[in-house]
UniProtKB/Swiss-Prot annotation:
Assembly, per entry: Part of the 50S ribosomal subunit. Contacts the 5S and 23S rRNAs.
Listed GO biological process terms: ribosomal large subunit assembly; translation
Source organism superkingdom: Archaea
Record's keyword terms, sorted: Ribonucleoprotein, Ribosomal protein, RNA-binding, rRNA-binding
GO cellular component: cytosolic large ribosomal subunit
Function recorded in the entry: This is one of the proteins that bind and probably mediate the attachment of the 5S RNA into the large ribosomal subunit, where it forms part of the central protuberance.
The family this protein is said to belong to: Belongs to the universal ribosomal protein uL18 family.
Alphabetical list of Pfam families matching this protein: Ribosomal_L5e
Keyword Magnesium appears in the UniProt entry: no
Recorded name of the encoding gene: rpl18
Organism, as annotated: Methanosarcina acetivorans (strain ATCC 35395 / DSM 2834 / JCM 12185 / C2A)
Protein name stated in the entry: Large ribosomal subunit protein uL18
GO molecular function: 5S rRNA binding; structural constituent of ribosome
Length: 174
């Protein structure tokens, strides 16, 4: 299939839609640790990754499934869970001695107010240093889950549950 001088096959991970090599090169040349945020419909995953010649090393990570340990019973794929996961990740990383990094959202669309930026706000609120503009963060009402509590009866206590979970996370790492 890839024969002849006029045809170039992209790298496998580019073909699969998993890696933007131009962005990855810029991030690697910065020589800073990357705070990688990945989301699915059910979870949000955040990792602190450092590049090395032998391959990337993961220093710290948090997944929204871990919020159940802190009493959070809501959905783990929403904006509220993304913020709490970012907060948990930031406090874990600070406890391990890491102080900052740069955001890596990969091939995800960069939309102000999205779950990616809710997770970033959680990381920044924990005290972890990431250069960013506060204009991209979602409103506090969305982070607390008031928009969900307004239309879903099962989640009517989500803002209170958010505050309780946030206090438990801070209590564990203080």
């Amino acid at each position: 299939m890839a024969t002849g001088p006029r045809y170039k096959v992209p790298f496998r991970r580019r073909r699969e839609g998993r890696t933007n090599y131009h962005l990855r090169l810029k991030l690697l040349l910065s020589r800073q640790d990357r705070v990688v945020v990945r989301k699915s419909s059910r979870n949000v995953q955040i990792q602190l990754i450092a590049p090395t010649p032998d391959g990337d090393i993961t220093y710290s990570s948090a997944v929204s499934n871990e919020l159940a340990k802190y009493g959070y019973t809501g959905a783990t794929g929403n904006t509220t869970a993304a913020y709490l996961t970012g907060l948990l990740f930031g406090l874990k990383s600070l406890q391990k001695g890491y102080e900052g990094g740069i955001l890596d959202i990969g091939l995800q669309a960069s939309s102000a107010g999205s779950r990616v930026y809710a997770a970033l706000k959680g990381v920044v609120d924990s005290g972890f240093e990431i250069p960013c503009s506060p204009e991209v963060f979602p409103p506090d009402e969305r982070i607390r889950g008031e928009h969900i509590a307004g239309y879903r009866e099962e989640s009517s206590d989500l803002p209170e549950q958010f505050e309780a979970t946030k206090e438990k996370i801070f209590a564990e790492f203080s």
